[in-house]
């Protein structure tokens, strides 16, 4: 299906490009240092699967049709943003260290990337029958585990809120509110260009507008431990997500 391939291509391109857009906005609008700006930018290129699920439920409730393969686009948009973020991290590393070969290996073999791509491949191979076999272990407890994870993320953001209050300037909060509008506008343009249904366009806008608070925080804690997690979690989870 040409439209499926075009949708995947658009999703990959948006996920690769949005961290660079976010990084540029952060450098102009905020006083964050380059390392924290790179870590924050990573979150705004990746996606929030919870927001995607919520948007899908809203569309279904309003009987607005969307392409079934948009969940595939969502899965494809997780990894590229992490790749872009890790590249940004390397470019802003202290002392301008050059780690081209090492960096490439680190990016391609990053644990989050391997798990995401590997899970996608396994799901493609096993299909619905494979999911049915393990649904009681994977599907049933998903929302409960996710709630616990979000509670933990909220605690982390809450504990760090006082510490980063001086850094969460008007510009920083404005960035967290403006960037989703930029992303959704780009998603709207690509969706209309591809010719997606109204629901598909809406979901691509949601994917482009959302900020990650699951996959990317875990990756940033490993790739950029010097960055302040309270900043990027507070912005993505406390400002953008609501």
Report residues per predicted region.
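Alpha-helical transmembrane segments of multi-pass small-molecule/ion transporters
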Residues: 2-153, 158, 165-168, 177-242
């Amino acid at each position: 299906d040409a439209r499926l391939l075009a949708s995947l291509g658009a999703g990959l391109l948006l996920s690769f490009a949005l961290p660079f857009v976010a990084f540029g906005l952060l450098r102009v609008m905020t006083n964050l240092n380059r390392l924290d700006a790179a870590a924050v930018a990573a979150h705004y290129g990746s996606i929030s699967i919870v927001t995607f699920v919520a948007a899908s439920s809203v569309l279904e409730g309003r009987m607005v049709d969307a392409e079934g393969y948009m969940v595939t686009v969502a899965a494809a948009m997780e990894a590229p943003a992490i790749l872009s973020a890790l590249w940004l991290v390397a470019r802003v590393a202290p002392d301008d260290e050059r780690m081209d070969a090492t960096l490439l290996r680190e990016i391609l073999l990053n644990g989050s990337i391997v798990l995401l791509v590997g899970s996608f491949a396994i799901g493609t191979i096993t299909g619905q029958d494979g999911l049915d076999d393990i649904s009681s272990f994977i599907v049933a407890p998903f929302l409960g585990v996710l709630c616990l994870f979000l509670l933990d993320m909220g605690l982390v953001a809450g504990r760090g809120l006082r510490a980063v209050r001086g850094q969460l300037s008007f510009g920083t909060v404005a960035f967290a509110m403006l960037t989703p509008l930029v992303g959704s506008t780009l998603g709207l343009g690509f969706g209309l260009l591809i010719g997606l249904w109204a629901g598909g366009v809406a979901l691509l806008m949601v994917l482009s507008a959302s900020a990650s608070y699951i996959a990317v925080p875990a990756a940033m804690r490993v790739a950029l431990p010097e960055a302040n997690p309270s900043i990027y979690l507070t912005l993505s989870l406390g400002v953008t997500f609501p």
